[in-house]
Regions:
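Zinc-dependent deaminase catalytic domain
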Residues: 1-152
Length: 152
């Protein structure tokens, strides 16, 4: 079964995630501008589905040793680089990780790699993450924060 980009909103609503339209618009716009067939994006939302932080894969080729910053790390680092009010820090959060194809408009496997998994696990308490949702070709997998160690 192929899940299209258009179905993301419906699938996230099944997870009780109701993001603002402009967040969906941003994701679609970024996917369409992407040069790669595989676009990864991560979103950190508060308990009311307000977007707190956003990150996508970034590729750095201008150095002697080219590297990639995965969307999960980019999103979390973006959170730390902002001036976040204490009441927002105290709120429970959801980390959503999506892999989208810009060419065939479908969801893909976005389960965090081992390094990103460790990075997320090391930041769960500080970020107050209650669950992580990641895409698969069939839809979404939702993992509660106390079960993240089993996600590997």
């Amino acid at each position: 079964m192929i899940i299209g980009i258009d179905n993301i909103k419906h699938l996230l609503q099944l997870e009780n995630i109701y993001m603002a339209e402009n967040v969906y618009d941003r994701i679609v716009r970024d996917v369409e501008c992407c040069n790669s067939d595989k676009f990864h994006v991560s979103l950190l939302l508060d308990q009311d589905s307000n977007l707190i932080s956003y990150g996508h894969n970034e590729y750095f080729f201008g150095t002697k040793y080219p590297f990639t910053c995965h969307s999960e790390v980019n999103c979390i680092n973006s959170y730390y680089s902002k001036k976040i009010k204490q009441y927002v820090k105290d709120r429970k959060k959801v980390l959503i990780i999506l892999r989208l194809s810009s060419k065939i408009k479908k969801l893909g496997q976005s389960k965090p790699c081992k390094k990103c998994h460790n990075f997320i696990e090391n930041n769960i308490d500080n970020l107050n993450i209650k669950k992580i949702i990641y895409s698969t070709p069939e839809g979404f997998v939702s993992v509660k924060s106390n079960k993240v160690s089993e996600m590997e």
